């Protein structure tokens, strides 16, 4: 028995399951759908997968093999690193001074004094 969802799975008769319509090619007991549409029509997955059976080209004439237009130019390594460094500096400059990136010594001491364990250690280590 074929797995669920195969094209010629006869155990899936009912309104919820879609039948594949149109001509089919039989290979080794399995039926595969093919479409014999116009040449300028866009190709589907089945057309490209089974094009060798029908004798069609893999690409239609309306799809020329052209490079991607919007492809970004690859930057040399040094140029990319320099740009990253510039971005990092500008981000650090934009940070407000009231919120430092790392806590100062006063903030650390007040935090340690508030916690019981660190407050105990701080008292006995600073004597």
Swiss-Prot record:
Main location: mitochondrion
Alphabetically ordered keywords of this record: Mitochondrion
Keyword match Mitochondrion: yes
Compartments, record wording: Mitochondrion
GO cellular component: mitochondrion
Region (Disordered): 1-22, 53-106
Comp. bias intervals (Basic and acidic residues): 76-95
Miscellaneous field: A stretch of 270 kb of the mitochondrial genome is duplicated within the centromere of chromosome 2 resulting in the duplication of the gene. The expression of the duplicated gene is not demonstrated.
Name listed for the protein in its UniProt record: Uncharacterized mitochondrial protein AtMg01330
Organism annotation: Arabidopsis thaliana
Lineage: Eukaryota, Viridiplantae, Streptophyta, Embryophyta, Tracheophyta
């Amino acid at each position: 028995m074929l797995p669920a969802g195969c094209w010629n799975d006869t155990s899936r008769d009912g309104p919820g399951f879609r039948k594949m319509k149109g001509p089919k090619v039989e290979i080794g007991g399995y039926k595969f759908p093919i479409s014999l549409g116009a040449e300028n029509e866009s190709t589907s997955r089945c057309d490209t997968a089974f094009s060798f059976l029908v004798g069609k080209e893999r690409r239609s004439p309306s799809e020329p093999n052209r490079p991607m237009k919007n492809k970004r130019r690859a930057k040399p390594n040094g140029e990319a690193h320099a740009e990253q460094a510039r971005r990092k500096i500008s981000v650090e400059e934009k940070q407000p001074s009231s919120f430092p990136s790392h806590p100062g010594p006063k903030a650390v001491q007040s935090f340690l004094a508030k916690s019981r364990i660190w407050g105990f250690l701080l008292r006995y280590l600073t004597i």
